[in-house]
Amino acid sequence: YLIEDHSDDSRVGIYYYEYGSYPRKPRVVYDRKHSSINHIEISDVPETMFYNTRLFHTSGITLGLGGNAQKFAIECIKKFKEHGTLISFDVNYRANLWSGEEARACIEQILPYVDIFFCSEDTARLTFGKTGTIEEIQKSFCEDYPISVVASTERTVITPKKHNFTSIIYSAKEDKYFREEPYNNIDVVDRIGSGDAYVSGALYGYLKYKDCQKALEYGNAMAAIKHSVIGDMVSTDLEEIKGIIAEHQNTGYHSEMN
């Protein structure tokens, strides 16, 4: 569904990204004040959407906007959950939107409704005060809340233009961890959006196959290929992703051309 804002002063939120190069880190500046998302109401959403949706996904960025955007996201989570929709949530913590204490207090309110939870190890430790190994951290979220699946990306930055990427997924139902070998020495054109690409791939794999290993493979492949694309949206298709997964799993000869 696409919900449009027809008000005279409607606008879309903007962010400005300044690329970094060692030793200077990249910077993001948000310009979201008075954007349409801050004025949306639950009544703007067609009622049929709550009955016909397999999965609802949102993130800590929306909650971090505060005010009406936060209220709307929480209302959506609760209403979708009432109608049996799977709830997916990515913490996606941004320190220039809110403090760690504010994020934790808000997110812990919605975790009882979440089925699929995306949270990095660093965020789990710094924002939620978790300790132990990443496996213990993931399992603890499922022990504290009725979460079914926890996914955490793992990135090693060799240089700003050379990264390794993989992830680990925990299934509470199976009490099992899923991993694969990392995508090593990724030539980074632009890393912005790789986290969202991972989430989209993981959710596709999970919904399509009902399999956490497939979720892991599609998530990792989507994130890896996103690094090769300028901008915050990945440009690819299903066949290319399947090919990347197959090549990643093949330890033999790799062709340089398709």
Model-identified regions with their sequence ranges:
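Conserved N-terminal subdomain of the carbohydrate kinase-like
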Residues: Y1-G60, I241-N258
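Structural motif corresponding to alpha-helix initiation and N-cap regions
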Residues: G13, I42-D44, G100-R104, I134-E135, ...
